[in-house]
Amino acid sequence: MELDYAPAPKTWSVGEILDHLILSDQVYFREIKALFDLKREGKPTYLRRRFSDFNPSVFFLPKSALPYLDESFRLVNLVLPRSLRTFFVLSRLVPTDAPDIARPRPGRSGDAIRQELAAGPVALADLFAGEPEADFNQFIHYHPLLGENNLYQLLTFLTNHETVHQRQIEDTLPKIKR
């Protein structure tokens, strides 16, 4: 099936790329919900995540070393401008592997992927509709690679992340054997 065709070893098929986007969105939708829950509980609306929460792979650093580098990355994020972090995300110059929680599930059906892709924007709209009076600048999510982001910035990251993978799909499609 074309959806499952990966053009080379250690590359993703179009289906896997789409599934990764689904899983990534679900992770961040849960993070946004957690921030809204903090507000409802009267707590500070700040989530600080660590490498151990996501277990990503960055550069050529072993995954097992990343939890020990949380503080180092925090310091880098204090001085690295957001525009440069965005450039690194969009350019794919910094090699990363998907975190375990967003690693695609091979062999999913096209129907299942389509249904989940269609459900994502609705789920996100429902999340924000539940907080009509909220100041989204006041909800802060910290990620060791992305630094501190309010909800507007987090949504911009999700858009940029999707753009990267749309390009990946565009690169993959011509390589599919028909």
Predicted regions, residues:
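Residues forming anionic-ligand binding surfaces in small-molecule and nucleic-acid pockets
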Residues: 99
